[in-house]
Regions:
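Catalytic phosphate/metal-binding cores of nucleic-acid and nucleotide-processing enzymes, i.e., regions
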Residues: 1-118
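Positively charged N-terminal leader segments that act as targeting/secretion signals
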Residues: 116-119, 136-138, 143, 164-165
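Short, intrinsically disordered terminal segments enriched in charged and Pro/Gly residues
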Residues: 119-125
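Cysteine-cluster motifs in flexible loop/terminal segments that predominantly coordinate metals
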Residues: 125, 129-157
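Short, charged early-sequence alpha-helical segments and their helix-coil boundaries
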Residues: 156-165
Length: 165
């Protein structure tokens, strides 16, 4: 399962806006889970024990969040309500680390593209393990069992070991 970092606004001018931001972060987290991902949404839980209004605690929370971001496969950016200062820092960090940042509105399309890429890589890997006669052909044409069997085994191996992305 791929690990993703959820990036969305948290700071707010008033309680209603804060509630909206929290609900949005929760919805993004649910969307990621439903997509088969393991989301990390630090601003939902770090703010439960750290005071966002105290600069030292905010800095400690941001540092901890960025350390978690480094371990993620990609970042989902929820930009529906704009990009906050904290989000900007998270996105810049992801870019500097070479971690992809995906717009939350495009997550489904992104996941479909990654799955197509994974399937193509699996197929290439399996065909690479075919016999010399069949390499590069769409179908196995030599009718030799060991060629088809080795290709099938390579395909099954690749299917369990290749991740999308």
């Amino acid at each position: 399962m791929r690990t993703v970092y959820i990036c969305s606004p948290y700071r707010a001018k008033d309680g209603a806006e804060l509630d909206r931001h929290i609900e949005y972060a929760q919805a993004l987290t649910k969307q990621a889970i439903e997509a088969g991902l393991a989301p990390i949404t630090p601003h939902l839980y770090m703010t439960q024990c750290l005071n966002e209004d105290k600069p030292q605690e905010r800095a400690a929370g941001m540092a901890a969040g960025l350390a978690l971001l480094e371990k993620c496969d990609f970042v989902i950016a929820g930009v529906k309500y704009g990009i906050s200062e904290g989000m900007s820092r998270e996105i810049q960090t992801a870019d500097a680390l070479g971690i992809e940042v995906v717009n939350a509105d495009k997550l489904r399309y992104y996941m479909e593209c990654k799955e197509r890429q994974r399937q193509a890589a699996i197929k290439r890997y399996a065909h690479f393990h075919a016999c010399d006669f069949c390499k590069g052909r769409h179908f196995h044409t030599c009718a030799l069992f060991y060629c088809k069997e080795s290709c099938r085994q390579a395909y099954e191996y690749a299917e369990t070991h290749f991740t999308s992305g």
